Regions:
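Second-shell loop/turn segments in exported
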Residues: 51-55, 92-93
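An amphipathic alpha-helical core segment
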Residues: 144-202, 210-211, 215-216
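All-alpha RGS (Regulator of G-protein Signaling) helical domain and cognate RGS-like helical scaffolds
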Residues: 60, 66, 70-79, 85-167
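N-terminal targeting pre-sequences for secretion and organelle import
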Residues: 207-229
Length: 229
């Protein structure tokens, strides 16, 4: 190999390495948040939550949060959704609202299931009785948080260390955010934005909350409780 061939081969290889690294960096930067399919059919929660509400809620509202979040974070350092929430006080209102909306709804769909309802069992049931007195008292307090939230927001059951606490947040905020008044790991949440219930219940939020207990996925809630740090 003569000198010219050596130089061409060496620098060609270096260029390939640099280009490959650049492509990987672009792929990492291009990583985007996605809208997962519902874990059940749109009409699976009937008669408690109607098909059209689920279609609009998932296909329009949740999809918009995902699209807006991707647009707002384009060209920035890739972070997990949880990392974004943990430092949301340093980020724009657009990222705050849409990261919260994406996390909240992704969890919300899994907190419900067809033929749900009933009562929790195991460690979760024991902790609810310990921290609220009984399951019925817990339901009453959670319902008050949901119906008492003025305007749009969420009601939460969260784990703080080894204790369960009920809280509510405005808009798409949640207890994982560093700006939350009450912080903790959500193990159950209820969306009380009007788009979650208005087609079927109009302004009767309390009726929606009462009906929602029939679709709660206590298996999922129990798993989140056990895994919460």
């Amino acid at each position: 190999m003569n000198r010219r061939e050596f130089v061409a081969t060496t620098f060609g290889g270096m260029a390939s390495i640099v280009a490959g690294g650049s492509m990987r960096a672009q792929e990492k930067a291009a990583t985007s948040f996605t809208l997962a399919n519902l874990p059940y059919a749109f009409d699976a929660l009937e008669p408690y939550i109607d098909k059209m509400t689920m279609e609009i809620h998932h296909g329009k509202h949740h999809a918009a949060y995902v699209n807006n979040l991707n647009n707002a974070t384009k060209g920035t350092e890739t972070k997990s959704l949880e990392d974004i929430l943990a430092g949301v006080s340093k980020l724009s209102p657009v990222i705050r609202n849409n990261s919260g909306g994406h996390w909240n709804h992704t969890a919300f769909w899994n907190w419900m299931k067809p033929k749900g309802g009933g009562q929790p069992v195991g460690e979760l049931a024991t902790s609810i009785t310990r921290d609220f007195g009984s399951f019925d008292k817990f339901k009453e307090q959670f319902g008050q948080a949901a119906t008492g939230r003025f305007g749009s927001g969420w009601a939460w059951l969260i784990k703080q260390h080894d204790k369960l606490v009920i809280a509510s947040t405005p808009n798409q905020d949640n207890p994982l955010m560093d700006i939350a008044d009450v912080k903790g790991v959500p193990v159950l949440g209820l969306d009380v934005w009007e788009h979650a219930y208005y087609l079927k219940y109009q302004n009767r939020r309390a009726d929606f909350v009462q009906a929602w207990w029939n679709v709660v996925n206590w298996d999922e809630v129990g798993k989140r409780f056990v895994n919460a740090k």
